[in-house]
Amino acid sequence: MVPKLFTSQICLLLLLGLLAVEGSLHVKPPQFTWAQWFETQHINMTSQQCTNAMQVINNYQRRCKNQNTFLLTTFANVVNVCGNPNMTCPSNKTRKNCHHSGSQVPLIHCNLTTPSPQNISNCRYAQTPANMFYIVACDNRDQRRDPPQYPVVPVHLDRII
């Protein structure tokens, strides 16, 4: 009985550790609203090269993000997608606040090729350009910190297809 109890406690601790790691990957820096963080991660590609553009995101998160997709469109265009019909989010079936882009957009997908946990400025990325549809989750804007011209804003890039 004791070995089973001990083993199950270890499994529970490992599972909780994995959940904590997974949950930490979806944390935004405190100075951003969810919409601002979406724009930083997925619209504002500060360089045409993934390695340089990802340094901005990695510096906020203090880690090398495994992958990221930049939509080569405007924030306003993505806000317009929030007006498309609601659908269940593919990555989280309990969320019903997703919207399909309806048309393909150019994008660049960045994939970590050289991790560097000790020095995030040494992380290197490969990039893949494409034209794809996307699904975005939208929520009401942060009343205190988001601009009032957009009552509903994108907060999560759920999927590219």
UniProtKB/Swiss-Prot annotation:
<dbReference type="GO" id="GO:0070062">
    <property type="term" value="C:extracellular exosome"/>
</dbReference>
<dbReference type="GO" id="GO:0005576">
    <property type="term" value="C:extracellular region"/>
</dbReference>
<dbReference type="InterPro" id="IPR001427">
    <property type="entry name" value="RNaseA"/>
</dbReference>
<keyword id="KW-0145">Chemotaxis</keyword>
<feature type="disulfide bond">
    <location>
        <begin position="64"/>
        <end position="123"/>
    </location>
</feature>
<keyword id="KW-0378">Hydrolase</keyword>
<feature type="signal peptide">
    <location>
        <begin position="1"/>
        <end position="27"/>
    </location>
</feature>
<feature type="active site" description="Proton acceptor">
    <location>
        <position position="42"/>
    </location>
</feature>
<dbReference type="GO" id="GO:0051607">
    <property type="term" value="P:defense response to virus"/>
</dbReference>
<feature type="glycosylation site" description="C-linked (Man) tryptophan">
    <location>
        <position position="34"/>
    </location>
</feature>
<feature type="glycosylation site" description="N-linked (GlcNAc...) asparagine">
    <location>
        <position position="119"/>
    </location>
</feature>
<comment type="similarity">
    <text>Belongs to the pancreatic ribonuclease family.</text>
</comment>
<feature type="glycosylation site" description="N-linked (GlcNAc...) asparagine">
    <location>
        <position position="111"/>
    </location>
</feature>
<keyword id="KW-0732">Signal</keyword>
<comment type="subunit">
    <text>Interacts with and forms a tight 1:1 complex with RNH1. Dimerization of two such complexes may occur.</text>
</comment>
<keyword id="KW-0456">Lyase</keyword>
<keyword id="KW-0458">Lysosome</keyword>
<feature type="disulfide bond">
    <location>
        <begin position="50"/>
        <end position="110"/>
    </location>
</feature>
<dbReference type="Pfam" id="PF00074">
    <property type="entry name" value="RnaseA"/>
</dbReference>
<dbReference type="GO" id="GO:0006401">
    <property type="term" value="P:RNA catabolic process"/>
</dbReference>
<dbReference type="GO" id="GO:0002227">
    <property type="term" value="P:innate immune response in mucosa"/>
</dbReference>
<keyword id="KW-0944">Nitration</keyword>
<feature type="active site" description="Proton donor">
    <location>
        <position position="156"/>
    </location>
</feature>
<feature type="glycosylation site" description="N-linked (GlcNAc...) asparagine">
    <location>
        <position position="44"/>
    </location>
</feature>
<dbReference type="GO" id="GO:0004540">
    <property type="term" value="F:RNA nuclease activity"/>
</dbReference>
<feature type="disulfide bond">
    <location>
        <begin position="89"/>
        <end position="98"/>
    </location>
</feature>
<dbReference type="InterPro" id="IPR036816">
    <property type="entry name" value="RNaseA-like_dom_sf"/>
</dbReference>
<dbReference type="GO" id="GO:0004522">
    <property type="term" value="F:ribonuclease A activity"/>
</dbReference>
<comment type="function">
    <text>This is a non-secretory ribonuclease. It is a pyrimidine specific nuclease with a slight preference for U. Cytotoxin and helminthotoxin. Selectively chemotactic for dendritic cells. Possesses a wide variety of biological activities.</text>
</comment>
<keyword id="KW-0325">Glycoprotein</keyword>
<dbReference type="GO" id="GO:0016829">
    <property type="term" value="F:lyase activity"/>
</dbReference>
<dbReference type="GO" id="GO:0003676">
    <property type="term" value="F:nucleic acid binding"/>
</dbReference>
<keyword id="KW-0540">Nuclease</keyword>
<feature type="binding site">
    <location>
        <begin position="65"/>
        <end position="69"/>
    </location>
    <ligand>
        <name>substrate</name>
    </ligand>
</feature>
<feature type="glycosylation site" description="N-linked (GlcNAc...) asparagine">
    <location>
        <position position="92"/>
    </location>
</feature>
<dbReference type="InterPro" id="IPR023412">
    <property type="entry name" value="RNaseA_domain"/>
</dbReference>
<dbReference type="GO" id="GO:0006935">
    <property type="term" value="P:chemotaxis"/>
</dbReference>
<feature type="modified residue" description="3'-nitrotyrosine">
    <location>
        <position position="60"/>
    </location>
</feature>
<feature type="disulfide bond">
    <location>
        <begin position="82"/>
        <end position="138"/>
    </location>
</feature>
<feature type="glycosylation site" description="N-linked (GlcNAc...) asparagine">
    <location>
        <position position="86"/>
    </location>
</feature>
<keyword id="KW-0255">Endonuclease</keyword>
<dbReference type="GO" id="GO:0005615">
    <property type="term" value="C:extracellular space"/>
</dbReference>
